Amino acid sequence: MYKDKNFYLNLFQVSEAQLERLAADGLKGGGSYCDLFFENTSYNDLLLRDGIVSSGGFHIDYGVGIRVLKGDKTGYAYSESTDSRSMAEAALAASKIAEGGTGTASAICCRTVTAPKDRYSYEYDWRSSDATRLVPWLEKLKEKIAAKDSRIVKIIVSFSGQVSDILMFNSLGELTFETRPMGILSASVVFSQDGKIESKNTSRAYRAGTEMLTESLLDEIADSIEAGIDDCFVAKRPKGGQMPVVMGAGASGILLHEAMGHAFEADFNRKGQSVFSEKMGQKICDESISIVDDGTIPFNRGSINFDDEGVPGQKTYMVKDGILTSYLHDRISAGFYGVSPTGNGRRESFRYAPIPRMRATYMESGKADKESIIASVKKGIYVDQFSNGEVQIGEGDFTFFVKSGFLIENGRLTQPVKDINIIGNGPQALADIVAVGNDLKIDEGAWTCGKGQSCPVSCGIPTVLINKLTVGGE
């Protein structure tokens, strides 16, 4: 659904001349760069508990954030109003926070920068869908899940939709604008068998409008809930220790994101807080490994047309054939390193300044097949679903709780396992990968990354074999 420049200017009640003046005023204190981020986001959500709508809501977040850079100093201020006085006060505050002295406003000429490709075009946005249109979809999903298994005792299905109108302008004269949709459909189910309780959760999230709601999506979610339930009831806690671990394709990518991906973000490297700070151009893992952070996958939760600094989204190789080739940059870190920004300057909302953040992070497929990887392991663990975990971002030390997996014995998956965690160091685990599968899967769940502020992300990985990790068991 294309909207032209005038739609955004009218929405935020600003003119190009005002944008030019605000950016120039932000530099009066001696700053070198100023940008403005306007946002109008509508949120709506519904929750169906055991067939009854138990909660729902709608709200709007509206405002502008203004940032001024001067050397290593950053000034940031925001306003929930876009009237001339409020914006002028925010620009002045940002300039003062950046420790400006005295200066003069420079002439800035506005020019529009268009996205090379719209990665999430949509026909109908969530603002046009009230509860009377959405509830039937939730009811239908609940019915499909209920029909899957007689052991189901509780079903919760929920929907969350948002639409963000974004306008950005900076002191380079670059004007960018777009509308970002997001839809999330989730299910949480409780099963009971012989007095034993187990649960499963799943979600699907896309940068899409109401057209994402289809019968096939409902079937996919219901099938996902059903899969592996029998294994849950017979799973046991195995003996722990250091052993080979096979990571299943798809959701195991969260380990790649958390334990390894953050170490590639340029702010940590610029400050010397990452183990990769001095390793650019060096071999850090097997040559079969290439790791990508990608903002260009159509309709993907982590994709962007522009990042939150107005830089077009792109596909960035952090690791290519085992060599560290790039960090993930915002404008600040790109200036420090003397490179181009990679489109990773992201923020939670207009209330936050952008920082380097991941988008869709994944490892590219290798040449091995899943079966041969498992067959190569005499004794180990196969894991494919995780819940919570902890990571020391700089060093990469991690602990992840395994939601589901299997023992590997003599090259075969045998006993289902549960109540275990895997413990290791991300960069070391990366170096210990000895096989990469040919089955890359990008997980479509509602992943959200927290780094002082929340951002929607995606992750993926093919089947990989890590030579040794510590498994916490009995």
Q: Which stretches of residues belong to each language-model region?
A:
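N-terminal small-residue-enriched
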Residues: 1-474
